[in-house]
Regions:
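DNA major-groove recognition helix of helix-turn-helix/homeodomain DNA-binding modules
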Residues: 26, 45-60
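DNA major-groove recognition helix of helix-turn-helix
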Residues: 36, 54, 65
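Short, basic-rich loop-to-helix N-cap that marks the start of a DNA-contacting helix
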Residues: 38-49, 68
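Short, charged recognition helix plus adjacent turn
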Residues: 13, 62-72
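A short, Lys/Arg-rich alpha-helix, primarily the initiator
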Residues: 1-13
Length: 72
């Protein structure tokens, strides 16, 4: 699964609108939409905010790991 698919999947799983996901990420709604459409790669700070909200590791969110858990 690629990053844009993961963002969309988690957003829908958590029943969050694109507008709310954008607020969580600290970006405009249109910018967030461009992440889900695969047109723009989010900054690391955005990815961290989204991974924290979705309660997954950053590696899992970006497809580098099959382990969803966060080592705390």
């Amino acid at each position: 699964m690629n990053l844009s698919d993961a963002l969309k999947r988690f957003r829908k799983q958590y029943k969050v609108t694109q507008k709310r996901a954008a607020e969580i990420a600290g970006v405009a709604e249109r910018v967030y939409q461009s992440y889900e459409y695969g047109k723009v790669i989010p900054a690391v700070t955005v990815l961290i905010a989204l991974a924290d909200f979705f309660d997954v590791s950053l590696d899992y969110l970006v497809g580098r790991s099959d382990k969803r858990e966060i080592n705390r």
